Amino acid sequence: LKCIGELSKRISCAAARPNLSFQNPDSIAAYYMEQLRHQEQEIMICMMLDNQNHLLNDTILSKGTVNATLITPREVYLEALRYHAVSLILVHNHPGGNPVPSQCDREVTERIFRAGEMLGIGLLDHIIIGDRQAVSMREQGFWLEPSKNKG
């Protein structure tokens, strides 16, 4: 019965958000804040978007420890390809409450960004949720320039 309740909740949430789109990082942070800010472990979510930046689906890619989560470009882009995503946004939490990106956050983001360039699926942002605050890596200047070596 517990599984049926969870399945029902997931179906109703999915049905309640057709063509859901976000205008800026603050609207994304607000959408995920309550889901993530009280978690005791890092959770990485991938938002998959269509060509008009409407949310196709979001999925939890990883549940980690109190200060780390393991994620690889392979896992990210398998999900993106499954939903025919044109672009994606990563969202994860820092259980300690401070949303400032760590060096590891920057390195993982760069690997995922570069893999997306090769696949033609853009990583638009990586948003980190803390306690009642969030950081957009793009807005804070922790973003990347496209590679010059294309083709």
Task: Annotate each predicted stretch with a short phrase.
Residues I45-C46, L88:
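Conserved active-site beta-strand-loop modules that form the wall/rim of enzyme catalytic pockets
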Residues D50:
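Short, acidic, Ser/Thr-enriched surface-loop or helix-capping motifs
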Residues R37-E40:
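Short loop/turn motifs at secondary-structure junctions and domain boundaries
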Residues L1-Y32, S136-K148:
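Accessory alpha-helical DNA-binding modules that contact the DNA backbone or grooves
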Residues I43-I45, L124:
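Short loop/turn microsegments at loop-to-beta-strand junctions
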Residues A30, S62, V66-G151:
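Active-site-proximal loop/helix of nucleotide/amide-processing enzymes and allied scaffolds
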